[in-house]
Amino acid sequence: MAYITKRGSSYSVRYTYQDEHGKSCDKWESFPTKEEAVKRQKQIEHELATGNFLIPSTVTVAEFLMDWLPKQCSKHKWAPKTYQSNLALIQNLIIPYIGEMQMQKLRPYHIEALYDTLSKTPCGQYVGGKRRDLSPKQQKRTLSGTTLHEVHQLLHNSFLLAVEWGILIKSPVPVEAPKKTTQERSIWEVDEMRAALDSMEDSILHLAVHLTLVGALREGEVAGLTPEDIDFDAANGMGTFTVNRSMQRVQKDTLAQVDKGCILRIFPDKLEGSKTSLILKDTKTEASCRTIFMTAALREELKQWLERLKREEALDPERYRNSGMLLRLPNGLAVEPVLIRKKFLKWQDAHPEF
């Protein structure tokens, strides 16, 4: 039952409910008019009678999402990058704007307002949950529709669970998601591929791009290859290489949260006190594991590259730090995906014709 009590010029609705631990709790809600109090009284009595009563909660969006995140990571055995990406969405694109709002006070128009705000927000405005000062040039590059779609998907999935957990009666996330932005990518013709490779003087970049073009590899997959993945005798001497690992650099805090079953190796830190780790992990799915036929040109380049690795190690075997990877720096350390990206962007700047 719910009771109405007049308090000065306002009316209070008092009712008793059981919290999630089965403890009996009294709650008072104040209204300026008797009509509003009566309406709320009937609503409470109906919800209590039908078992649809929502236990009052002051939990905020930030508190809920930071509780939801590790639970989902553990349940679905997320890869480090998946956890890190979702954490970044929460810290940088959700909490700064609606993090302090109480979950039960959130309405669809709040979410729509968030999407509108984000559509005008510069990329990198927040990093690690902290606001950054951006240059005028940086402020012109706003978040893409694809990023907004990712925020929507995270809110949609997490708030459905908030309903299951009894925090919400209904999710406030709108049904319609922000539209993804699609960007057409030009695909090189065979002659363009050859011309591009011919213009690459950096041997590491040349091999990385050559492997990428032949096998449609991601940067992490290229960096994750080892000499053992190369088989020159396979396919009647044509040669193949196998893709079944990916290299990533992730936050050490992330590694503490994720299931380590997919992690094959954690590389030693280059710098003392580093907050990130370079890891080698399984590829995303079984479909991502594949064996790729070499072209004659790639086969020859790989043979020369492996000979080069032997020569570099023989120059100073005591100081050579053999990472065991196919792509290595002259000192034997692994070539990270970000280095491949930097080398490619530098080449791109020097060759705008491609």
Where do the protein language model's features map onto the residues?
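Conserved hydrophobic/aromatic pocket- or pore-lining residues that grip, position, or stack substrates
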Residues: 94, 111, 155-158, 166, ...
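Basic, Lys/Arg- and aromatic-enriched nucleic-acid-binding interface segment
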Residues: 124-132, 136-151, 164-225, 235-238, ...
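Short, basic (Lys/Arg/His-rich) helix/loop patches that form interaction surfaces
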Residues: 123-124, 198, 202-205, 215, ...
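Short, Lys/Arg-enriched alpha-helical recognition elements, typified by the DNA-recognition helix
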Residues: 57-163, 323-326, 341, 345
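Conserved tyrosine-mediated DNA breakage-rejoining catalytic core shared by Y-recombinases
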Residues: 12-14, 177, 192, 225-311, ...
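Short, surface-exposed polybasic/aromatic micro-patch for ligand or macromolecular engagement
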Residues: 2-58, 77, 283-285
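Arg/Lys-rich amphipathic alpha helix in sigma70-family domain 2
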Residues: 160-169, 304-307
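Phosphate-coordinating loops and pocket residues in cytosolic domains that bind phosphorylated ligands
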Residues: 66, 105-108, 120, 169, ...
